[in-house]
């Protein structure tokens, strides 16, 4: 489907936004602010260790995919594009294990992201921590 915002020259730009299902700030302002502070603190720590901003956004997109949060996927995809991430890697992210587009460091970060995000009822394997630390 082609619209004014989705053309051959600009295939990924859209004026549509993902609807917000719940206004967290209005209904749980303290919780929302705590999450925002946690995100800011995590970003500061990642900046201290020179963690690539593009990889940071890929990690956030992948966690959002696993959590099924359309709003977060949309937000972090826009942030990844703004940081210079390639469309190819963004599109391939859900199948990152099957593509050659990701480095060993990327793969370690994505594997750890999946383990931590999906750890309900299990634990994060030691091998994932070890691989992430090695890269």
Where are these regions (language model features)?
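Short Fe-S-cluster ligation motifs
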Residues: 25-26, 30, 92-119
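Short flanking/linker segments adjacent to small metal-binding domains or redox-active Cys/His motifs
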Residues: 109-135
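Amphipathic alpha-helical segments within well-ordered protein domains
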Residues: 43-44, 60, 77, 94, ...
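Helix N-cap / loop-to-helix initiation motif
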Residues: 52, 86, 134-135
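Alpha-helical scaffold segments that form or flank carboxylate-/histidine-based iron centers
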Residues: 22-24, 52-69, 97-98
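Conserved alpha-helical segments that form or flank metal/cofactor-binding pockets of metalloenzymes
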Residues: 60-91
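Acidic, glycine/proline-rich low-complexity segments that act as flexible tails and inter-domain linkers
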Residues: 1-57
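Short acidic alpha-helix initiation/capping motifs at coil-to-helix transition points
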Residues: 33-37, 68-72, 120-126
């Amino acid at each position: 489907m082609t619209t004014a915002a989705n053309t051959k020259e600009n295939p990924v730009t859209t004026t549509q936004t993902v609807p917000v299902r719940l206004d967290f700030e209005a209904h749980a302002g303290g919780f929302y602010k705590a999450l925002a502070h946690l995100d800011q603190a995590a970003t500061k720590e990642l900046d201290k260790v020179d963690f690539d901003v593009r990889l940071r956004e890929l990690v956030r997109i992948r966690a959002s995919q696993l959590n099924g949060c359309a709003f977060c996927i949309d937000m972090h995809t826009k942030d990844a594009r703004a940081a210079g991430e390639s469309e190819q890697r963004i599109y391939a992210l859900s199948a990152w294990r099957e593509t050659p587009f990701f480095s060993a460091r990327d793969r370690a970060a994505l594997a750890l992201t999946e383990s931590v995000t999906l750890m309900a009822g299990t634990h994060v394997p030691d091998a994932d921590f070890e691989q992430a630390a090695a890269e």
